[in-house]
Amino acid sequence: MNKIKRALAVGAHPDDVEFFMSGTLMRLGQVGYELHILTIANGSCGSMDLGPEEIARVRRREAQAAAQSIGATYHEGLANDMEIFFERPLLAKVTAVIREVVPEILLVHSPQDYMEDHQ
């Protein structure tokens, strides 16, 4: 019996996985991994022109389309932008996704990243 190999990429915002991890995910998909993408924040602060709810919807659709284009399952944002705190409620949500996916490989931001949300 073959065990399904899974990879989970976790990004702080919509577009982070696409910019920082999509090449690695695509390669993992080519060698048989089931791909998953989790975005912590929903992208609600991602525009100077659109309101928070509208830009969050736009960025969610874009992230879903990007995930679909590489054959990945997209797990939606768990918090609003600017609300990524290292606290139990958010950690519980992230843990729930990790337990659901049970990844062999977990891709995350570099700890030396330029942006606080990425740490």
What kind of feature is each model-predicted range?
Residues 1-102:
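Active-site rim/loop-helix segments in enzyme catalytic domains that contact anionic ligands
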Residues 94-119:
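Active-site adenylate/phosphate-handling loop in enzymes that bind or generate adenylated species
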